[in-house]
Amino acid sequence: MGGPLTAAGGRGDGGAKAVEPLRPPPPPDPKTMARWYQLEALERAVRGNTLAFLETGSGKTLIAVMLLRAYAHRVRRPDSRRFAVFLVPTVVLVGQQARVVEQHTDLVVKQFCGEMGVDFWDAATWRSQLEDGEVLVMTPQILLDNLRHSFFRLQDIALLIFDECHHARGNTPYACIFKEFYHPQLNSSASDPLPRIFGMSASLIYSKDLNQHNYSKQISEIENLMNSKVYTVDSESALSEYIPFASTKIVHFDDSNISSELHANILSCLNRLTKKHIEALDRKLHGSSLENAKQRISKLHRTFVYCLYNLGVWLAAKAAEVQSYEENSLSFWGETLDKNVEGFIRNYSEEVHRELSCFLKNGHIGEKFPADSQDGILTPKVHCLIRTLLQYRHMQDLRCIVFVQRVITSIVLEPLLSSIHQMSGWNVKHMAGSRPGLLSQSRKNHTEIVESFRKGKVHIIIATQILEEGLDVPSCNLVIRFDPSATVCSFIQSRGRARMENSDYLLLVGRGDVEAHTNAKKFLASGQIMREESLRLGSISCQPLENTLCEDTYYRVESTPAFDIDKASGTCTLHLPKSSPVQTVNVEGEGSILKETVCLKACQELHAIGALTDSLLPELDVPCDEEPDIVVENKIEQPSYFPEEFVDNWRSFSRLGIYYCYKISLEGCPKTASPTDILLALKCDLGSDFTSSSFKLPGGQDNASVTMKYVGIIHLNQEQVIIARRFQTTILSFLIGDDHLEVSNGIKYFHEMQVPIGVVYLLLPLVSGRIDWCSMKFSSSPIYEANNKHMTHCHSCRDIDLLQTKDGPFCRCILKNSIVCTPHNNIFYVISGFLDLDANSRLPQHDGTVVTYKDYFKTRHGLTLTFENQPLLAGSKHVKVRNFLHNYYYKKEKEPGDRYSVELPPELCRIIMSPVSANNLHIFSYVPSIMFRIQCMLLSVKLKVQLGPTVQQFDVPVLKILEALTTKKCQEEFSQESLETLGDSFLKYVTTRHLFSEYRLQHEGILTKMKKNLISNAALCQLACSSNLVGYIHAEEFNPRDWIIPCLDYDERGNKKISFLAPNGMYSQRKMSIKSKRIADSVEALIGAYLSTAGEKAAFLLMKSLGMNIEFHTEIPVERKISMKAEEFIDVRSLEGMLGYKFNDSLLLLEALTHGSYQTSGPTSCYQRLEFLGDAILDHLFTEYYYSKYPDCTPELLTDLRSASVNNNCYAHAAVKSGLNKHILHSSSELHRKMSYYLGQSFTGPSYGWEAGIGLPKVLGDVIESIAGAIYLDSKCDKEVVWRSMKRLLEPLATPETIEPDPVKGLQEFCDRRSFKITYEKNHVDGVSSVIARVKAGETTYSATKSGPCKLAKKLASKAVLKDLIAGHKDTEAAAV
């Protein structure tokens, strides 16, 4: 053990008098109260990077404070510009640790967290913070972001402290600080000092793996990552003099003995309620609200089932009660519910609470614990918790934490423990995460609870892992693990909370749970194993960090400047990389400082052209119009447009007299006795796009389609308009509505209220080409009014035989071919005629008995039939209106007589409509889908007009525009996906051309960033919003129940369903919530629609009309600064023969083959800019080729074909196969070695698929792209020339028959279908990277290990495992895979 240090960081006499009075007197030196191991750890930390691995409560923070005092002279202002950083994993720890440092040092401490808006601070703001800040306490993400933005430099930090350093793993912010900044600088030749590293943790293992053999490996990994060595003590006994250790005990509970019958009854009850409420949602909600509500009810159901099995009926009921609180408008999954959904969720929870309460016995909980457990009121585990707590009733000043796994468990245990009268003297609180949600708690709530716990006002806290680390919780005399620890770290930290003398740490374990007992023993031994392994590794130096991006090393070549110095003449020439806008710099001067002089001049020239900032840093943000500063929300709420052709004032519409008519014919549907069509009458002509048009109805029967044809104008008087209006209102209300009152109110609403403005058009049934006025006149009359006596007969009937109905006597002719409703069960029926049966006829029952119809209705419905001799009506359920645009396979329904035949007494029926033909019912059931498609087509025509005359000149079919605006979520016969793929490639192609031409001094990296900003989803979304494009997007599946019936466009409260949008002169039906990416996809799909039907000019002008500031020059001129002959460097003739193209400017071919490492005098540019251009050209060429070659392929297949052909591996394979690798100019020995290694293999076969060119250096693929760019420029931007030449190199091309699926995707799909678990593990041993793929399939584990770059090795390993799995599972599905 080392002796105490002498200097604690005090300042000297000189140079500090001006600031000395501003500082308070220094606090007492904490070393005077430090323990021996703390002083020993401090000495180790001063000498080198150290990780202090000590128990919770052993004073690790004090070691950090002493280290800060030791480093005070290095960070104190104004003598030093460096500072110390204290990193903590959670926000709550920022203020906590900052206060500790302030109490024990005289350093200026500043604290930072995300709530301060630090994400939006610029370099100037951070500089102002560092003016006087000496110790900065913050979360690690803030430091990582600042390092990435170069606001901080690692060398400016003198001391870097990591609290809870076990979080340094994977890609956490702790780990990224080391991987991205510390280790690169550690391995570089830079002389800048690195900060001293000090880490603190109570557990070095943060893993679920309890295998003791892996402890050494994990400790070594964290040491290597943090470049530090672990300091710890020999055993717990070395600390026991200073730290009280809890007595760990295992408390057993029995298995649940609740009867299986009771459990089954309760579970059945939950399932029934869940099904009931989900079915209710289908009738009341739609779209995103419906899915949202269904998901939440399903999640709640799983939560209640969890509580039932693990906690008992009482707590399951309590969980339902908590969720039913009205103020709890947020689900505990953290997503805000819309107003329509909140009520359904609360109703569901309330009903679950009522039903579960029925299973609870009367009486106070806890009066008879064994009986409660026996009856399932509480599980044995909960009973064990209560029994255990009651054993500590004698304890004075109880401080207890009960650790649970789930938030809901902590919430419901609080009222349970509070309600037990034996615990009435104890105050119980729960604590869970501060995320938004169920009974959400803020950090202020947490602080108040902990403070009450400290003062003894709260005795028991039921907490999730939030109390394992972070908050400064007082020492406890009792800690109970209700749920087992998930990791070693969790176990050690929760045990560390029991730090009082004679404290207990209790583990609740099932009596027969062997695994839990084994884990508990391993947990107990883990601390000592970690100490022993840490001490054993103490003499082993830290190893360099493994390179996790090893695949890049195969082709990455570091560009270094080259100096040509002539000491005799005093001149120096600096050669910069070929990608630099300045490539050579010449100076004359004094020999001893020639390098410095030429570098200064190079900086001046680079700064002059904007390649360096004023701070002489690379300019990564090029200020230009092409890089807008865009922030777009993930979801955008926009109005959904409605066509103005369908909107008018009903009063004025009925007086027009002249109406434009379109005949709508439904084809491919069942043949009826007298086929009918529909006549659509409108206020205006719809234009040339609707003179004659047709579209399919994939949701109907095979080959169902609609033809729409303009047939001229007709004259209608006001009475005829009213008759037609009544008819369509009645029949459509009946077909769409499923509630008698709803339909009746809708029909009455028509008569009672005149709509000032709304959806206005007429749908007139045709018979033999003529309007069926007879059917409309009588079937739309208000029969439902019982006092309408003149309607007891139809106009031509002489029959005096009246039948008694619910609304009085009616003639047989009225009842035949009518629509009736039976109020006793609220069901609609279509009446086709009369049966030779009456109330006394016999009705066979399912059980074999026979009753009369009179007895049946009396027994079943409590109805007495008084008109026994009336014939029964032959009824059937009416055809349901559904979404016939939905792209699902049509299944032929049974004939009504086979399935829906029913016998109805007339006296139980209320006539809704009569007469109504079966033909009219059938075709009008298609009307909502037909009119919605016409509505969308009208909007597509409107969009064509809105885009302006320059775009309108191109004849793009309306259905093609509609395809571009229809998302996959609509589930229709077409979607925008294929057009989006095509438009995306053209957008990249045009943007790349523009940037390549406009910014000739910028290298490929800057151009790529500019392109990304130009065509990012955020940029495209902003363009769409600015162009008022979003309202045209068809983003949700059509729901016929939401379709507006002409005339009935007010809701039940009298609110309009159609509104006028003054800013853009459009009408809106509703508001929709749409993701910004979906909007961007629609822009790309529109570009694809214009490209595929009208060509490149049309697509480009569309992009311009949307506001894209780009140009599309027919040629891109090439400038030459130096004249040279390409033949002196490459074999031009041989290459031209290989490519099938003769260059006009062979220097372009030379540039395309020149690697950035080639510093020999001659070529002035490397291939990077040409690669940037060629990449976009090839991507577009392949996409266009596959889109036109396979017009009927699915969007998924189009994407797979494109991916299989357009990737660097395929290009690299083609380059080697053709011998292009022999012509590449480079000066990198490393690249030469890698190429030689891989080129020793055989490269034949096709150049497509993921296996083509695997492992080849990236430069080989880059050359294919750069040559494509060179040919494109040389041929004056002729894509056909490029395609012919590149096709020679890349053939044979992928086809739908030859494409090979991605093995990672294939393995995932195979395992998902069987619920197999897949894991991937990366290894790096002796410089060789590998990936192990494992699949747990029942009792069998399949695994494969493959070496190589990470992505490639993962695919190879997946392929091998998938092959073994298929061989081991010889079923039909496996064979298909």
UniProtKB/Swiss-Prot annotation:
Domain PAZ: 798-913
Binding site for Mg(2+): 1171, 1262, 1265
UniProt-annotated stretches for the region Disordered: 1-30
Residue intervals of the Dicer dsRNA-binding fold domain: 534-626
Localization: Nucleus
Site positions per UniProt: Important for activity: 1258
Enzyme type, top EC level: hydrolase
InterPro entries per the UniProt record, alphabetical: DEAD/DEAH_box_helicase_dom, Dicer_dimer_sf, Dicer_dimerisation_dom, dsRBD_dom, Helicase_ATP-bd, Helicase_C-like, P-loop_NTPase, PAZ_dom
Main location: nucleus
Binding site for ATP: 54-61
Location of the motif DECH box: 163-166
UniProt cross-references to Pfam families, sorted A to Z: DEAD, Dicer_dimer, dsrm, Helicase_C, PAZ, Ribonuclease_3
Bias type Gly residues, positions: 1-15
UniProt EC number: 3.1.26.-
Residue ranges of domain DRBM in the record: 1302-1367
Segments forming domain RNase III: 940-1095, 1132-1276
GO cellular component: cytoplasm; nucleus
Superkingdom, taxonomy of origin: Eukaryota
A molecular function GO annotation: helicase activity
Domain annotation Helicase ATP-binding: ranges: 41-222
Coiled coil: none
Summary of the function given for this chain in its UniProt record: Probably involved in the RNA silencing pathway. May cleave double-stranded RNA to produce short 21-24 nucleotides (nt) RNAs which target the selective destruction of complementary RNAs.
Subunit structure: May interact with ARGONAUTE1 or PINHEAD through their common PAZ domains.
Record PANTHER family: DICER-RELATED, ENDORIBONUCLEASE DICER HOMOLOG 2
Family stated for the protein in its record: Belongs to the helicase family. Dicer subfamily.
The name this protein goes by in its record: Endoribonuclease Dicer homolog 2b
Record organism: Oryza sativa subsp. japonica
Higher taxonomy: Eukaryota, Viridiplantae, Streptophyta, Embryophyta, Tracheophyta
Gene responsible for this protein: DCL2B
